[in-house]
């Protein structure tokens, strides 16, 4: 009986942050600037701006894909908070975003995101 309870608890932990899906985006020069034109300096801000450009301003790069999670400003603010957490992006991923125009994949989970570089 104790083993069954432990297995149930472990299964619950494993599903605590289920993957919802992913999308691919090119973080281009237009994503390095805020909507009002000032330069952004952080990778999390740039990934958030990419989603604003996709959903709100319809300024899309040819490599960009849509997503079902970051349509509103509040959802994009949540995205930025998740991107700023440890483990969301490696330091090399952050540098690639800030210093270039990489193609990224964003894996979206219930309570977190993870960003990886597909093409630098």
Label each residue range with its predicted role.
Residues 95-119:
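Short, exposed beta-strand-loop hairpins at the edges of beta-sheets
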């Amino acid at each position: 009986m104790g083993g069954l309870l432990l297995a149930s608890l472990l299964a619950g932990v494993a599903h605590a942050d289920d993957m919802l899906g992913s999308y691919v985006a090119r973080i281009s020069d237009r994503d390095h600037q805020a909507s009002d034109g000032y330069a952004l300096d952080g990778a999390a801000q740039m990934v958030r701006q990419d989603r604003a450009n996709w959903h709100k301003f319809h300024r899309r790069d040819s490599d960009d894909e849509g997503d079902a999670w970051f349509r509103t400003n509040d959802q994009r603010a949540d995205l930025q908070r998740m991107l700023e957490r440890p483990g969301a992006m490696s330091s090399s991923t952050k540098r690639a975003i800030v210093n270039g125009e990489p193609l990224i994949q964003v894996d979206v989970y219930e309570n977190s995101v993870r960003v990886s570089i597909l093409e630098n």
